Amino acid sequence: MCFWTNLSVWMILLSHSLSLVSSTETGKTLTQNNSRAGSQGLLEVLRVLSAGDHWSLNHPQSLIKILLERTGCPQRTDWTQGDCKLCLEADALLLTAGGNLEDELREEVVQRVSLLLLYYIIHQEEICSSKLNMSNREYEFYLHSLLGLRQDEDSYFLSEKETDDILAFTRKYFGTSSSQCMETKILQRESGIQGSNGADEKTLPQLAATIIALSLQGVCLGRKALPSPDDFTEYIFSFLNSTNTLHLSEIEQLLNMLTTRRTCAKEDKYLHQYQRKQNTEEHSLRDPKTSTAMDKESDDHSPSWDQACFSARQLVEIFLQNHSSLSISKEDFKQLSPGIIQQLLSCSCQMPKDQQAKPPPTTLEKYGYSTVAVTLLTLGSMLGTALVLFHSCEENYSLILQLFVGLAVGTLSGDALLHLIPQVLGLHKQEAEFGHFHESQSPIWKLLGLLGGIHGFFLIEKCFILLVSPNTKGLPLVNEHVGHTHHLGLNPELNDQSSGGKSISTIQLKGPEDSQTTVLPIGNVPASNRNGKTISLLAIMILVGDSLHNFADGLVIGTAFSSSLESGVTTTIAILCHEIPHEMGDFAVLLSSGLSVRTAILMNFLSALTAFAGLYIGLSVSADPRVQDWILTVTAGMFLYLSLVGMLPEMTHVQTQRPWMTFLLQNVGLVLGWFSLLLLAVYEQNIKI
């Protein structure tokens, strides 16, 4: 009798399962009976499970208890002995779903109970540990909790990704087989879900009933069947000669292919279709808000598995069934070898070239390109000294200086915020790994907005000074900018005075605590001072400070080129734009201290050579990536301080004869510096040197 009862149960379950799986994927409208298949199927399963117990058929509380036992203890095989320890009560579950303990069990109540069971499956640990009591909430709370499973999805619909997350939980919970799985879209159609948005408040309970009914029958849901181990071996043999045997020459050919990777050139059309899954199913089961380790399939068809990129966990699942350990033994590796070889031959896991992370620069590249960069930096400092020699026109000198000061602020702050900080935080590595432009560039746009806030407040303050108090005396022309290597501020006032047909230029030196100005004519410096053998203390201070500054610049450039060629290029541009106005101020102070033009140029050149010493020290100490990150972190802070604390206030309070033209050139320099660093930050992966 028991045999025939069990046989009838399994025949009914099998017929119901086949009726669901055999449904076609055509676009025909589902009938009302099909849309209600989930709840009716679950009721049918409950009636079969309670066969022989006529009392339970007429009491909804007993049916819900049977459903709760089967759902709460899915791995239990012997249902005739012992009790199942449940974390839910059938009465509370039925009342929360809007049912009655005495009335007949309605389909709507069955669907709601199924939805509550899905919530229980997802949050079983919290519920069973008494951290979450389901009887304290209304049914609508659980409904909206499932609809809002992912924060990045529409909270009014259960999207396909959210459905995949739920099905991943149910597969793990019920321990269903990974073969002959029903696809998510077929499951949605069986539940009466017509739209592309997914299930809503009305259709989600039907979907929940279908999921519970099929899971109780052991049907795998939401994931296509993985290939068998023999399929990988078949692929390898078919790839080489399409027979059941391999010759030694073909084994040699296989080794050559794996060594040279020539086979990947033949499969370039597949490289853009697949990527290795970043989140394994185990991770997805722990966090429903993240995506599961499932292939994103097209609406019409899914790709063949032989061009699919399998994760390490999936290969273990295919070749080593019931393998729960994270370690792989030698015997296990022997079984995994065909899968690894097949993945290498198919090239399905190789990323496109434009998304591959670039290798670190070689020793020759680091030393070669960085030496060229420091050489250009030295020549750029000489350009700054050359601009001071054109002091005959005070107005043009002031405008050129402010243009370069704005350019220095833009490049220094832009390099720190758009390049160095994202690099030390690892954002560039994520961009190279995933290759999604809009997603990976999101931090860059946010940091650009930060620069926009800085520029906006600079405009407000500058306009306030120009419009409200145009006659207020500002700070000297170049104050802190040229003073970070010494303690003197510099205000070049280039006054053209007619004296025997000669133009006399003067430079005003102004200390931070001195309110009086000392006028030192460049052209009328006493010969005893200009040709004397002694060098003033001011010149020595400038020489030492400038040497240390250039040494630090070389150290930073060496570290940047050790990290990547792109980082070296951006850092060199930022330092070069900063160095030109800096050297203009230092050279002017050297001339005013009594040195001749030739001596001042020589001293400026000698101090610039210390950058090479810093360069080669930086290249040697920054071989370790951790050292690189720390040096670049300090460099970003130094750049922000120099640009925002030292030079931007000077731009705000500069005193000039043409304030609006100065204001325009300052903004041109700022925008040009930020825009150039933005282009480098966005397209640095495409830079080829």
Swiss-Prot record:
It catalyses: Zn(2+)(in) = Zn(2+)(out). GO terms for molecular function: zinc ion transmembrane transporter activity. The chain crosses the membrane at residues 202-222, 370-390, 398-418, 448-468, 537-557, 601-621, 630-650, 663-683. Residues 223-369, 419-447, 558-600, 651-662 are cytoplasmic. Highly expressed in brain, namely in the hippocampus, frontal cortex, striatum, hypothalamus, and cerebellum (at protein level). Also expressed in neurons in the Purkinje cell layer of the cerebellum, medulla oblongata, and the frontal cortex. Abundantly expressed in the testis, namely in the spermatogonia and spermatids within the seminiferous tubules. Keywords: Glycoprotein, Membrane, Transmembrane, Transmembrane helix. GO terms for biological process: neural tube formation; neuron projection extension; regulation of microtubule polymerization; regulation of neuron projection development; signal transduction; zinc ion import across plasma membrane. The keyword Transmembrane helix applies. It holds the Pfam family EF-hand_Zip. The keyword Transmembrane applies. It comes from the Eukaryota. Its main location: membrane. Uniporter that promotes Zn(2+) import from the extracellular space to the cytoplasm across the cell membrane. The transport activity is temperature dependent. May play a role in neurulation and neurite extension. May play a key role in maintaining intracellular zinc content at levels that reduce the inhibitory effects of rises in oxidative stress on spermatogonia and spermatozoa viability during spermatogenesis. This is Zinc transporter ZIP12. It comes from Mus musculus (Mouse). The lineage of its organism: Eukaryota, Metazoa, Chordata, Craniata, Vertebrata. The gene is Slc39a12.
